[in-house]
From Swiss-Prot:
Annotated Gene3D superfamilies: Homeodomain-like
SMART domains linked to this entry: HOX
PANTHER family hit by this protein: HOMEOBOX PROTEIN HOX-A2 (PTHR45664:SF3), PROTEIN ZERKNUELLT 1-RELATED (PTHR45664)
Sequence motif Antp-type hexapeptide, location on chain: 94-99
Compartments (UniProt record): Nucleus
Region (Disordered): 42-93, 194-225
Keywords linked to the UniProt accession: Developmental protein, DNA-binding, Homeobox, Nucleus, Transcription, Transcription regulation
Organism: Bos taurus
UniProt-recorded name of the protein: Homeobox protein Hox-A2
Similarity remark: Belongs to the Antp homeobox family. Proboscipedia subfamily.
Length: 372
């Protein structure tokens, strides 16, 4: 008893090896092998072996020695395994998570044989397409093929109206032999296409504008540089022209002065003497009256104009200035030298103090010229 108890404890606690199982238990009958071969030939499904208790007699409660003779008698293996197993018993139970979601792929097939029930459903491509077409919501909707006339009419309508109201949509669908949904979907897709095209154009235009702005800025900078350079050149040219013009004027004036000095120097010594002599004669002999003074002033002015030549008017020399100053001073002395009663008769009002100062200065100037 102790040996058997230890053997049972060791068998339960530790898994026995394959050799130990084969030596300790009697061999399996050939009927099981033959029945299993027959069932495997009948069906292509996975083989379901009998329970583990039936294969091992030691685990079978009827064959254990402790149960004695009161246990169930061992059934005959030939009678139990000779008859084929029904198809319903071999089919596994169907659980909710094993059910397919789409009703389109469910095929109701009659359970004629175990192979047709358990094996994979082999359908042709045409049958699968028919099943997919038959199911409305499960399959993907086919793409609509529009004709050229339909596309032309839709494009014309989109050109005038980007959005359609429902009456117009129904009208177009009736005219083009389309459904209202097809017209609506086409307009939605066409609006998205139009949006993409406009965005691309805007991006290209913005890039072009940016490039044009950069080019215009560069052109403006170049023009500014050119304008500054041209202004500098023009200023320098103007300065050079001015310098050349002034140099030419100076040269011409020097030439004219030299020519006038050489040509007119012979006549000048005579003319001042004649004018001075005339002035002195008038100053000595004539009485200091206003009419005489005016006559002498007219004569002196005429003599002065006669003495001045056109060459002397254009380029006056130092001698001309001296002659003019002496003549004018003499003429003024002749005009101012009369007494106070004669000068008071003149229309110009002059005070006595200013008149005395003016006569004193003129007499001093006349004396200086007379000394020469």
């Amino acid at each position: 008893m102790n040996y058997e108890f230890e053997r049972e404890i060791g068998f339960i606690n530790s898994q026995p090896s394959l050799a130990e199982c084969l030596t300790s238990f009697p061999p399996v009958a050939d009927t099981f092998q033959s029945s299993s071969i027959k069932t495997s030939t009948l069906s292509h499904s996975t083989l379901i072996p009998p329970p583990f208790e039936q294969t091992i007699p030691s685990l079978n409660p009827g064959s254990h020695p402790r149960h004695g003779a009161g246990g169930r008698p061992k059934p005959s293996p030939a009678g139990s395994r000779g008859s084929p197993v029904p198809a319903g018993a071999l089919q596994p139970p169907e659980y909710p998570w094993m059910k397919e979601k789409k009703a389109a792929k469910k095929t109701v097939l009659p359970p004629a044989s175990a192979a047709s029930a358990t094996g994979p459903a082999c359908l042709s491509h045409k049958e699968s397409l028919e099943i997919a077409d038959g199911s409305g919501g499960g399959s993907r909707r086919l793409r609509t093929a529009y004709t050229n006339t339909q596309l032309l009419e839709l494009e014309k309508e989109f050109h005038f109206n980007k959005y359609l109201c429902r009456p117009r949509r129904v009208e177009i669908a009736a005219l083009l032999d389309l459904t209202e949904r097809q017209v609506k979907v086409w307009f939605q897709n066409r609006r998205m296409k139009h949006k993409r095209q406009t965005q691309c154009k805007e991006n290209q235009n913005s890039e072009g504008k940016f490039k044009s702005l950069e080019d215009s800025e560069k052109v403006d900078e170049d023009e500014e540089e050119k304008s500054l350079f041209e202004q500098a050149l023009s200023v320098s040219g103007a300065l050079l022209e001015r310098e050349g013009y002034t140099f030419q004027q100076n040269a011409l004036s020097q030439q004219q002065a030299s020519n006038g000095y050489n040509g007119d120097s012979q006549s000048f010594p005579v003319s001042p003497l004649t004018s001075n002599e005339k002035n002195l004669k008038h100053f000595q002999h004539q009485s200091p009256t206003v009419p005489n003074c005016l006559s002498t002033m007219g004569q002196n002015c005429g003599s002065g104009l006669n003495n001045d030549s056109p060459e002397a008017l254009e380029v006056p020399s130092l001698q001309d200035f001296n002659v003019f100053s002496t003549d004018s001073c003499l003429q003024l002395s002749d005009a101012v030298s009369p007494s106070l009663p004669g000068s008071l008769d003149s229309p110009v009002d002059i005070s006595a103090d200013s008149f005395d100062f003016f006569t004193d200065t003129l007499t001093t100037i006349d004396l200086q010229h007379l000394n020469y």
